[in-house]
Every structure is written in structure tokens, then in C-alpha cells.
Amino acid sequence: MDLQQYKSISEPEHQLLGGVKVELRNICTADNSRLALSRIKPKNGKSLAIPVVLIHGSYSMRSFWVSDKGVGLGVYLADQGFDVWIPELRGHGLSPKGESFSQITAEDQIRYDLPAIQDAVFAMTQTPAFWIGHSFGGLFLLAALSVGWLQHDQVVSIVTFGSQISFGDTYLKFPPVAWALSAILKMAGNFPAPKLGLGPEVESAGTMIETIRWKQFRGKWTSSEGVSYWDGLANIKMPVLTYAAVDDKNDPPAGCRKIHKRLGSIDKMFMVLGKDNGFSKDYDHVGMVVSKEAQEEVWPDLAGWLKDRI
């Protein structure tokens, strides 16, 4: 494909991660931020011709979906015949942080990053995609669909893992705590997740402050213009698979179910990953995607659901 007509998409750089061939491109958003976009093509020509876009959560990056050793859900889906695309949201992984890193907001990623990713993937495949998001990656995806920043006709279906906004982080319900944390973040410029063992990436102060606004006492899940992301969930009509995990203390099942119930999809499924539903263990927030057990029972469950909707 001649990418010269798409000025916002670079030519690919070819990488090898543990024997897995990866194409790395840079794309440009409408507000002129540069994002890294990795692609793993279907293995051995076993192509289903359907793109799958994987959106990481907070404190995360490409390695959540494909490790440096070439292991991960992204590789598994490519082995199953899917055309896998792994973007890194601004300020994460190979997407540059830049001088204004501290000012990056959640809305920047919802309003600008996700549409740029959708445009790039569609430009290079001419095919609507499956979208999968973990944690805030899934929440951002739902928000973008809710207010129409993502084009619904280019989304085959969506899958979320541990994505919610209503529960967890109960300390933020105490106004003095929320105010103090916001003030500290403004001074620090970032949230040092790696030092706290929460993930490989620091998160911008702007993103953290915005999520505090959503979760604090009487907080509202809205855009900067006051548009409710909740209200538009009923407009999401494509098939949806919502995964929640029994031992997820970050984003518990009750919060995931609350969002799931608001979705307008007729074809929607809610699955709690735990022993009571026939799984080998009660999964937690990260282990529901990244663990040996997930590799054996969650990944095949997901792949089967996707294939049934081709």
C-alpha cells in the first residue's frame, strides 16, 4: 500500500520480539501528537482478514499485549488468524512523552488518540475492526463510542477487561484526600506507578487529576465540556463482551456490571472470571489477561467469541 497519501502514517520499521515479527509505525493525531502503532500480522497466512485493536490501560504499554519474549494475547490472536494492532497512547511506551507530558489528559487520549488509531487501521486495512481494552483502555474506548468520537460503523464488536468507573479507590470519596492528591500531582507532574509496583509506565498528572474528578465524592464521568459518557452508552449497539474478575480490587465486577447494563447492545455478554463460573482460579486485575491460566482458558474463550462474530 502506498502510504504517501496518508501523511499521518509512517512507513513501517520491522522488529523482532522473541521471534515474533512486528511492524512499528508512527501515526499523528489531529492535535499533532505522535503515537506508536505496532502490528502483528496473522501467522502462516492463516488470515481471518479482521483487524483487532488492543488498547492498554493506565501505567501500561505495548508489553502488556506482547512481551519482549514474544508472548502475550496479541501474539495469540495473530496465531489464531487475526490482524493485530497494538497502539500506545500518548506518553506511553514508544509514544513520546514530550515537554508537555504532565498536561496530557484522559480526554486527550479519548478524543484524539483513539480516533487517530481508528483512522490509521482502517486506512491500511479498509476493514472494520474488533476493539479490545483492558482497564482504563476499555473505559476510554466506551467513552469515545458514547460521544461519537469513534465511528461506530468501523467497529465490529468490543471487549473490555476490568473496565469501570464506579467502585474502587474509595479514599477518593473523602474530599480532603482528593484535593490533596490533585495538588501533589500538579506539583509532581506525574504519578510514579513503577516505583509503587503498579505498572511499567508513569502516568501524567493531567490524566490522574481527571480520573480523580470522575471518581471523587459527587464526581461525574463527563468530558471537559460536561457531556456525560454514561448517557451515550445506550447508543453502543455493536456486540459487546464484558470480562470482570472475582479478585479484581482495582475494578471490581459490580462496577463492570453497572456499565454493561447501560450498553444498548442486544448481543452482549457479561463474564466473571472465577471458580464459580468454571475457571481454574479467581482472577485479578492483571492476571485476567496476563497469566499462564489466562493463556490456557481466557484467551481461547475470547478468540472463540470473536470468531463467532465474523
Where are these regions (language model features)?
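Alpha/beta-hydrolase-fold enzymes
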Residues: 122-127, 131-132, 136-224
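N-terminal cap/lid segment of alpha/beta-hydrolase-fold proteins
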Residues: 6-44
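Short alpha-helix in the alpha/beta-hydrolase fold that links the catalytic acid
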Residues: 252-262, 272
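Alpha/beta-hydrolase active-site loop
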Residues: 103-123
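Acidic catalytic loop of the alpha/beta-hydrolase fold
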Residues: 247-251
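Short beta-strand/loop motif that positions the catalytic acidic residue
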Residues: 236, 242-244
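Catalytic active-site module of serine/aspartate enzymes centered on a nucleophile-bearing elbow/loop
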Residues: 269-310
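Short, surface-exposed "cap/lid" segments of acyl-processing enzymes
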Residues: 42-94
